[in-house]
């Protein structure tokens, strides 16, 4: 039995009654039609009535939202400035620790940021480009990324990520994130980033014009809101240059085609993996990444060959006491169980810096 909802049959009746076409009656076998009450959304159906070359179609009768919008677990908050989305950790997103990798976390941060700006009407042709940016061939590129993970989600865990953006002076914009465990509401991570504008044709940085700023400021909180509100938090620490010779190295890293993004260069998440390639194996075996900070200094293209260098940060260079995100003071005992490293990514050909980094590792906990 063919079943159509009452809503759909009404649409069909109105369509034929309002049409100016003249339809030649066609004798067809009578088929029973039953109507039923819809419990959730009205049926999105397609019906065709063919005679010769003519075709009448009724489709997607309810809303103008796209299938992607209906499948996402994301929404703008009531203030209209921040955006939240839920993600389930999939099996291919976990690593040797049976938890999500830092690359997975970074990819989710990028995904929720892109979904946020797409939700408010920015273009999907590039990362959050406004109308003026598209006219002037301008794109956003990452200048700095700082991620702190207090607890890594495991396979099948659901993570809720909140994000928002705001102006960062005359040269760029800032985006922050807060990650929560959906099951407990516990904050399991925070992140912040700085973005600058680049001309897509010349590949040179460009100041943010008033016209572009006016286009995105309407979606930024009127008052500053920071994921790391403390003035002395580690996200603000300057990363010194790593001097030769480095203690650890991984030479000759080559970008894969899959590492390139829609901005025609190596995506910022790939740099995280390259930095970790030169971490000593004994640290990987006994520790997990707690904090990573990256300063992006130069874009990397597909034909570039990259060297990853790492050196332990000496105790004198490590701040022994920092105010934590909950207002507590980090104990020296806790610092003793952690390892700190400085990193640099540079071109193999001429030694030009691509990226500077700092990582902080804690002892693995038993699960």
Curated annotation (Swiss-Prot):
The active site is at 263, 265, 300. Its EC number is 3.1.2.14. It is found in: Plastid, Chloroplast. Residues 1-48 form a transit peptide. It is an enzyme of class 3 (hydrolase). InterPro entries: Acyl-ACP_TE_C (IPR049427), Acyl-ACP_thioesterase_NHD (IPR002864), FATA/B (IPR045023), HotDog_dom_sf (IPR029069). It comes from the Eukaryota. Pfam families: Acyl-ACP_TE, Acyl-ACP_TE_C. GO terms for biological process: fatty acid biosynthetic process. GO terms for molecular function: fatty acyl-[ACP] hydrolase activity. Keywords: Chloroplast, Fatty acid biosynthesis, Fatty acid metabolism, Hydrolase, Lipid biosynthesis, Lipid metabolism, Plastid, Transit peptide. Its main location: plastid. It catalyses: (9Z)-octadecenoyl-[ACP] + H2O = (9Z)-octadecenoate + holo-[ACP] + H(+). GO terms for cellular component: chloroplast. Belongs to the acyl-ACP thioesterase family. Plays an essential role in chain termination during de novo fatty acid synthesis. Possesses high thioesterase activity for oleoyl-ACP versus other acyl-ACPs. This is Oleoyl-acyl carrier protein thioesterase 2, chloroplastic. It comes from Arabidopsis thaliana (Mouse-ear cress).
